């Protein structure tokens, strides 16, 4: 027999919320009648609860169709913000979602620097990063965890190194988030990306962009959404039902915490306890 380990299935809490939205809320949300208002409230609930779990502000979390598409939108925002000659660091430990879009910035006059893995271990070494890190670097992109060699990279240390030269960081958490929700506040990264369908949720990309950076990057949405952080990097309308259903991911964390531990704790603390169960 062959045992194949794939992504997580969607939890019942998400499925129930998705079903409820499609059968009771399938109208334009945020209107002034019951079904519309309830739909908007459920979308807001998902953002608020997931942001609390990850220890970030509510308006720092955005939803998109996938992590790959979120990254392409961010790359376009950086392309309109960076200057020719600015440097961007990418790795060969990343999968394409967090490297291809950034490498294309070379077509806009940015310098792309490669942080190569050790050829024997497949790991990213901090000394190798230090050798290519200077004040020309404006963005450092790297994975939280490699889905090939399984290395969990020291995110907080890498972020500190990047910040020391004035660069911001973009962490691909697609391979890490299935093992537990990240405490992004503690990690300190400027951008964190992962896919909710690999974390018991609907097929959405979840993108955290910290407030200061979000306000500096070029708006990618309609001009009338430019002042709304949760809309700046969502060029098209969101999938209302899937965004609302993402609150079921928080329901699932709460259910696991209540069953195994119980008692009072803030959302981020509950998520840390559930993550430790892995």
Identify the residue ranges that each predicted region occupies.
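Pyridoxal 5′-phosphate
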Residues: 1, 5-278
